[in-house]
Amino acid sequence: MPFVNIRITKDGVTAEQKKQLIAGVTQLLVDTLGKNPATTVVIIDEVETDNWGIGGESVTERRQQAS
């Protein structure tokens, strides 16, 4: 049973976009590895930008500096 965990920043990703991610990742596993879609699990975790760090800074800080 394949298990895929997708972590993204919480940036207003729509329900439709999440649906497309789940379907697309599932299909990729079917096409590439021959996995059964009925037993493929995809979980999307949305992380607040204050809780996601890159290079010692939160994504929130990095985005503020970039703007």
Swiss-Prot record:
Q: Report the GO molecular function annotations.
A: isomerase activity
Is Signal found in the keyword set? no
- Tell me the SUPFAM superfamilies matching this sequence: Tautomerase/MIF
**InterPro entries, sorted:** 4-OT (IPR018191), 4-OT-like_dom (IPR004370), Tautomerase/MIF_sf (IPR014347)
Q: What is this protein called?
A: Probable tautomerase K2
So where's the catalytic machinery, residue-wise? P2
Reply yes or no: does the keyword Iron apply: no
